[in-house]
Amino acid sequence: MGKAQKKKAMRRHNPMRVPDSHIPKGLESAASSTRKDKVEAVLPIIQKVRPGGMNSEDVAERTWACAAVSNLIQNDPATRRLLQGKNVVGTLITRLSDPSEEVAAEATGALRNLCIDGGFDICAEMFNKGIMGPLTEFIPKLSTTLQNVLSNPKSAPEKVQELVYEFAENIITILWCLSETSNKALNAINSISLIPFLMSFLINRAKLPRQVVHASVQCLYVLSEDNPPAIQTIRSESEYVACLVAISTAPQGPNDDEWDIGIRVLACGSLRNVSPLPAALNASSIDIDRSIALPFITPLLSYSLDGAVEEVKNTLANPPAPAPQNNSLKFAKLPKSDDKSPAEILLERIERRLRVLQLSLEILTGVCAQLPDPEPVPEELEDEDEDADMDREEGLEDEIIQSDADDAPMDEEPPSFLASPEADQNSIKLLTTLIPLLLSLSTPTSMSFPPSSATATITTEPTHLPTTSALTSVHISALECLSNLLLSFPTSDTGPVNPATAEVAVAAWPRAWTTLTASINAPSTTDRRMELSVAALGVLWGLARLARGVLAPQKEQVELLIQVADSTQADEQVQVKCVGILGSLAQNTREIEMNKAIAQYLLSYIHPTPRSAEPTLHALSLLIDIYADEANTYDVNFRSLKGTEVLASSITPLRKLVRSIDRRKEGGTELRRWAEEVEGNVRGFVTYRRKLKI
């Protein structure tokens, strides 16, 4: 059983700040925005979008229209979609070529906010409406301006420098959002040689505002993930690699905040993305995971979510008074905060810290997902050949199905599995260090879920949707990270488990189970509720595996796992996780009744009709593991359920199930190979059990 691999598909590095589903009546409101205040707020913008507005000869009018769009769309799907219907995206893109730099800057700001709040659909619309044209033209101009400003700071007034940095930050943010929209958009970005432009900000980070440096390293992190052109560009320049190493290993200063930590986390992630480093580089000898990533990220996991929630609640209940305006503060307009209250600034700081934490967990998940490549399958191996081999075995299989005879072919021993290497002390130490931290971050808080529709109007608890969205992301990332850690931990599928790791797993089980039940019982309006539940199941599977035969199965837990696996919402992966958990719980020799209930359920995956391929194969493998030793106290259950005969009668439908696996689909070759192995194990197991005559 392999550990979960880090998934890239449709996983945004800058997730929507607040999903539409979190906003009360967000989607419904977007479909029919008739509220008077909304109409009154949007009508002037619509007028400005039309000729005489953004297309006005008056620079101030065009600037105002772009700025107003930028302000109105934040966390408001109704206004955003209303403006979309008026082609605001296309109009803003035309404003990128405005002769006024101020108008162009405001347009990039509005497009940036649309990218972050609107998600993939708006990014795709921007790409399809030709945004790459003007963006591509900006890169060399900004590079030249940046070089001039850095070499001679007095060559441009401070206000001009602020505009340049703000403009660059917006452009870079749009590009990183576009890069995650489609392969077509990514290829277009690869073609403009963006990496040197981004690295120029990182190399000169000490002279630049942190926000633009942060945007640059964020974009670099996204582009360097599974993207060979970007990876090769970074690896080919020793200066780039040295810069990333320097940022990742920089000691934390006493005044460092979320921006500084975020920059280091992203640099660390980018460094991992381009590994292994070429041998010619000095940094090639560094073990990035053990020497940089783990020592840096582990302390970040101590952040208290409950403390953050309390700070948010206190800020909402007692917002701090505005501080005296300080117009001389350098780069105060980066990012725009002129009109934000102290409470808004504080809440954004907390949200930003949560996003940094989520990103750290994402990188740590990758550290825990280092699997060796599967053995290559010879290209000349074809389905027809495999099916022919299986046909030649049918006579033998039919004998197994129909015969109890003593001379039936059998192995001397039941099917066995290669034991995984024993865990060393360093691995156990890592496990005992990370499990409590990750469990703490995965446990829902009082603000982790939006209020249900039934309680939204009567609750007195303060709510802050951006915090709720960020907390959900942290919980899911922590669970996925913990799942990878647990499922990658060396252990065997048979025989005794390591007592030290079993003790850790048993202690962690109740809290992980609480997270699962909390996610299942969360309000139906909770965005990513199913994703949270699936991640929690992955953790429980890993814990059950480490404490196989030690964990005592509880009746209500077994019933809930069966209920989840059989629900209409459960896909194959959910069923696999539930089956895996149940299979480990069934191996407690003191819980005979629970063993029987689980065995009945596992047998239902093959009899009377096989279910989906992967969960069925897992169920069969687990049945063999559970009843491999006929001397176990619970073996009486297998006999009373006539397990041997059920498995014998299942060989023909199992053969058909194996043949139905399409090797041409992603993962199909590996699944087909494993299915054939399971089929062979079932045949051997049936023969072995019949030979026992018990």
Protein language model features and the residues they cover:
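Acidic, serine/threonine- and proline-enriched intrinsically disordered linkers and terminal tails
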Residues: 2-41, 141-164, 292-473
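Extended, charge-rich low-complexity regions and/or helical-solenoid scaffolds
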Residues: 2-7, 483, 487, 491-655, ...
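Elongated alpha-helical scaffolds that mediate protein-protein interactions in large eukaryotic proteins
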Residues: 31-44, 51-64, 68, 72-90, ...
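Buried hydrophobic core positions in alpha-solenoid tandem helical repeats
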Residues: 42-51, 88-93, 126, 131-142, ...
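Short inter-helical turns and helix N-cap capping residues of alpha-solenoid HEAT/ARM repeat scaffolds
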Residues: 57-58, 99-100, 143, 164, ...
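Alpha-helical solenoid repeat architecture
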Residues: 63-77, 91, 105-120, 163-183, ...
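Fungal eukaryote-biased detector of long internal structured cores
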Residues: 119-121, 127-359, 363-379
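Eukaryotic acidic, Ser/Thr-rich intrinsically disordered low-complexity regions
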Residues: 305-313, 317, 342-347, 368-369, ...
